[in-house]
């Protein structure tokens, strides 16, 4: 289990998650509601759940509006965008923009949002149907930000490089994967890195689960 360690080891897992969820709701969400005088608290909660369930996925205020708007009364993408910005201002989530490596320009739509600590996700949404590849990507994003890098999602010839991390004259490219056991998967993950023509370091970070030794 990776994440914040806020409670004593004598507490059961469910109690820990209840405590962590309460910390998130009390210290972050409720403070945001009060600071920005948010009336539609249900919408805020739905946006939080959506972003938690879609860490490492491309998201925008419009596609979130379309998703949530189909479930309840009509909502406006400007309101959703404001609520997303409030969550980022409170450091609950971090927005990472897309960057066209060849064109050397930022792309104006579909950013990625990373959760400040994915233990909040466990606590509020549980572990069912969790994509560990996206969780690993979230961990890498937060660690890069913690180390002082400016972080972007790289786009090159319509292919994605998970991270372009820049700090002063330093630049690194990173692909993250939880499984490259199949050749097609390996080629898909590595191909974008091989197409980058500069001399900056390029890494592929993998999660490998331990396997029992034969015999």
Q: Where do the model's predicted regions map?
A:
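Catalytic cores of nucleic-acid endonucleases
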Residues: 154, 178-209, 213
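Active-site donor-binding loop signature of nucleotide-sugar glycosyltransferases
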Residues: 118, 176-178
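Structural motif
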Residues: 170-172
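Short secondary-structure boundary/capping segments
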Residues: 3, 104-105, 194
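Accessory nucleic acid-recognition modules appended to NTPase machines
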Residues: 17-168
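Hydrophobic/aromatic beta-strand patches that form the interior of the parallel beta-sheet core
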Residues: 114, 174, 203-205
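Single conserved hydrophobic/aromatic residue that forms the stacking wall/gate
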Residues: 1-8, 13, 207-215
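Alpha-helix C-cap/termination motif
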Residues: 5, 147, 166, 196-199, ...
């Amino acid at each position: 289990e990776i994440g914040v360690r806020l409670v004593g080891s004598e507490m059961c897992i469910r109690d820990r998650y209840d405590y962590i969820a309460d910390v998130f709701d009390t210290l972050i969400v409720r403070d945001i509601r009060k600071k920005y005088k948010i009336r539609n608290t249900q919408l805020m909660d739905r946006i939080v759940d959506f972003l938690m369930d879609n860490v490492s996925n491309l998201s925008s205020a419009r596609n979130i509006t379309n998703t949530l708007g189909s479930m309840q009364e009509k909502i406006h993408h400007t309101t959703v965008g404001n609520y997303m910005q409030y969550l980022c201002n409170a450091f609950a989530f971090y927005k990472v923009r897309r960057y066209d490596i060849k064109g050397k320009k930022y792309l104006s739509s579909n950013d990625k949002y990373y959760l400040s600590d994915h233990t909040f996700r466990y606590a509020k949404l549980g572990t069912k149907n969790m994509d560990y590849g996206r969780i690993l990507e979230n961990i890498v994003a937060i660690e890069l930000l913690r180390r002082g890098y400016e972080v972007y999602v790289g786009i090159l010839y319509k292919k994605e490089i998970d991270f372009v991390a820049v700090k002063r004259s330093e630049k690194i490219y990173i692909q993250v994967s939880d499984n490259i056991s199949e050749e097609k998967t390996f080629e898909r993950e590595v191909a974008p890195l091989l197409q980058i023509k500069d001399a900056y370091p390029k890494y592929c970070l993998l999660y490998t689960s331990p396997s029992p030794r034969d015999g």
